[in-house]
């Protein structure tokens, strides 16, 4: 029985999915993905799965695999409005791999998921370029990913990104709450800006309530508001690994959603408290702008934004100088921001005290 061909019948392209545009995006991103390759990576882009030679883990006595999945939230809307896409890829790597390094794990590889309303090959390639550049900074390989076109669910210019990463740590070198002791120092590492959390509040306050334009020059920033908001999230992975190799690090805390105190509390054991002194640093002007424009209370800011601290290291008090020297050698702005105590006046695992400097 022969099939009847109906002129103008339905097709995938007519439904809004452009396979050829997707293929073009893959071709454009290949050169960037190659830059992330590690010796353990087998095969190339375009297979059904990314391959990583696990025999490389034989040098570990008891290797533990660490995994994390994350995205960059509504910061993607700033990128969309600004027409800048590569920085979002950088942000994605930071959000995923800096969660992995917290337990002492070395980042190994990552995969990404890019969801778009319509495939614009150059835009997708720019996002992947940023992911690849971030992977190089984190020391991991980009072994695969997925670009999904969702016409009807997303507008033609809309997109979102997510990623998953894997790392490895020797079992007896796993960092965390069980290593923390009274008297340990809390070392803060400076953030590059807002990073990738709190953008729903920031967008609401600055763009909706404040009526500010992303192209507006902001004197305190020395650049436009949009450029400030798109400042890439700092990637601390290799800095933390270097610190772990040279110093007796007890724990790390990646300051993301929920703010400094809430994330620090996640690694503080029962019976101990982390006391962080606000007077040891001055938050960047962007935090003050958000607070002033929206009349946002300090506690609300601190529950939502990083307030200038992107990563915390907890080390023995006697290791403080060595830790700060290692970070300084790597160009990381860091300082002693507090201590671990067993005093019971604070009911939560971490608390901010005092007032910010400046």
What does each model-found stretch correspond to?
Residues 2-14, 123-141, 154-159, 213, ...:
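Glycine-/charge-enriched secondary-structure boundary and capping motifs
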Residues 2-40:
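N-terminal amphipathic/basic leader segments beginning at the initiator methionine
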Residues 18, 70, 183, 254, ...:
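Residue-level signature of catalytic and energy-coupling elements of molecular machines
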Residues 26, 125-128, 199:
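Hydrophobic face of alpha-helices
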Residues 29, 51-54, 96-97, 202-205, ...:
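Buried hydrophobic packing segments
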Residues 31-192:
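Glycine-rich phosphate/pyrophosphate-binding loop regions near the starts of catalytic domains
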Residues 60-61, 75-76, 196-198, 263-264, ...:
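Short helix/loop capping segments that flank catalytic or ligand/cofactor-binding pockets
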Residues 182-227:
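Acidic, glycine-rich loop-and-beta core segments that form the ion-binding/anion-interacting portion
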């Amino acid at each position: 029985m022969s099939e009847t061909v109906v002129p103008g019948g339905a097709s995938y392209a007519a439904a809004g999915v452009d396979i050829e545009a997707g293929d073009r995006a893959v071709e454009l991103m290949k050169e960037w993905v190659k830059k992330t390759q590690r010796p353990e990576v087998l095969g190339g882009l375009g297979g059904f799965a990314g391959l990583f030679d696990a025999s490389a883990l034989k040098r570990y006595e008891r290797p533990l695999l660490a995994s994390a999945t994350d995205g960059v939230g509504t910061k993607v809307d700033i990128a969309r409005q600004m027409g800048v896409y590569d920085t979002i890829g950088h942000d994605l790597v930071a959000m995923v791999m800096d969660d992995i390094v917290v337990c002492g794990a070395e980042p190994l590889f990552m995969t990404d998921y890019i969801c778009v309303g319509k495939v614009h090959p150059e835009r997708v390639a720019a996002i992947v370029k940023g992911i690849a550049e971030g992977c190089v900074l984190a020391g991991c390989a980009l072994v695969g990913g997925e670009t999904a076109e969702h016409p009807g669910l997303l507008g033609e210019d809309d997109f979102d990104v997510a990623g998953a990463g894997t790392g490895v740590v020797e079992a007896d070198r796993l960092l965390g709450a069980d290593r923390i002791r009274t008297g340990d120092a809390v070392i803060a590492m400076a953030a590059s800006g807002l990073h990738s959390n709190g953008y729903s509040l920031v967008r609401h306050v600055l763009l909706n309530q404040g009526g500010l334009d992303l192209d507006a020059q902001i004197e305190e920033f020395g650049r436009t508001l949009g450029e400030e908001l798109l400042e890439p999230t700092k990637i601390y992975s290799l800095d933390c690994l270097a610190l772990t190799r040279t110093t007796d690090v007890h724990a790390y805390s990646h300051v993301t959603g929920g703010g400094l105190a809430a994330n620090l509390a996640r690694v503080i054991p029962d019976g101990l408290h982390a006391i962080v002194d606000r007077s040891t640093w001055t938050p960047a002007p962007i935090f003050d702008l958000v607070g002033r424009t929206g009349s946002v209370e300090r506690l609300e800011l601190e529950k939502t934004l990083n307030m200038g601290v992107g990563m915390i290291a907890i080390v023995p008090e006697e290791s403080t100088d060595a830790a700060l020297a290692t970070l300084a050698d790597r160009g990381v702005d860091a300082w002693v921001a507090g201590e671990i105590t067993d005093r019971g006046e604070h009911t939560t695992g971490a608390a901010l005290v005092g007032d910010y400097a400046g």
